């Protein structure tokens, strides 16, 4: 500071000296790319569904939360499971 009051260029210069240290702060470390999604854990489920003839069918699956919800939607909607006896009858029709 040259006078009794600081001028704008002098204040900016002093702030730059405080903000910009002389040490090299650039990081040259390379990071390996990680998968965007974390692995979701598989949980065992037992699915009990009925065939059209009334037989009970059991399925055992490993699924994520999203996967078991999708399976539930399919079984309640567009997909129907059949027992081995009904499958045999369907083959001969």
From Swiss-Prot:
GO terms for biological process: DNA-templated transcription; symbiont-mediated perturbation of host cell cycle G1/S transition checkpoint; symbiont-mediated suppression of host innate immune response; symbiont-mediated suppression of host type I interferon-mediated signaling pathway. Keywords: Activator, DNA-binding, Early protein, G1/S host cell cycle checkpoint dysregulation by virus, Host cytoplasm, Host nucleus, Host-virus interaction, Inhibition of host innate immune response by virus, Inhibition of host interferon signaling pathway by virus, Interferon antiviral system evasion, Metal-binding, Modulation of host cell cycle by virus, Oncogene, Transcription, Transcription regulation, Viral immunoevasion, Zinc, Zinc-finger. It comes from the Viruses. Residues 1-43 are annotated as: E7 terminal domain. Highly phosphorylated. One of its GO terms (molecular function) is zinc ion binding. Its main location: host cell. One of its GO terms (cellular component) is host cell nucleus. Gene3D superfamilies: 3.30.160.330. A zinc finger (unnamed) spans 51-86. Homodimer. Homooligomer. Interacts with host RB1; this interaction induces dissociation of RB1-E2F1 complex thereby disrupting RB1 activity. Interacts with host EP300; this interaction represses EP300 transcriptional activity. Interacts with protein E2; this interaction inhibits E7 oncogenic activity. Interacts with host TMEM173/STING; this interaction impairs the ability of TMEM173/STING to sense cytosolic DNA and promote the production of type I interferon (IFN-alpha and IFN-beta). The E7 terminal domain is an intrinsically disordered domain, whose flexibility and conformational transitions confer target adaptability to the oncoprotein. It allows adaptation to a variety of protein targets and exposes the PEST degradation sequence that regulates its turnover in the cell. Belongs to the papillomaviridae E7 protein family. This is Protein E7.
């Amino acid at each position: 500071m040259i006078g009794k009051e600081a001028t704008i260029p002098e204040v900016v210069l002093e702030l730059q000296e405080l903000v910009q240290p002389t040490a090299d702060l650039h990081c040259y470390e390379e990071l390996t790319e990680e998968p965007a999604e974390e692995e979701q854990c598989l949980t065992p489920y037992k699915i009990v569904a009925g065939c059209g003839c009334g037989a009970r069918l059991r399925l055992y699956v490993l699924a994520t939360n999203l996967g078991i919800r999708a399976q539930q939607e399919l079984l309640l909607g567009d997909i129907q499971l059949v027992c081995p006896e009904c499958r045999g009858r369907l083959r001969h029709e």
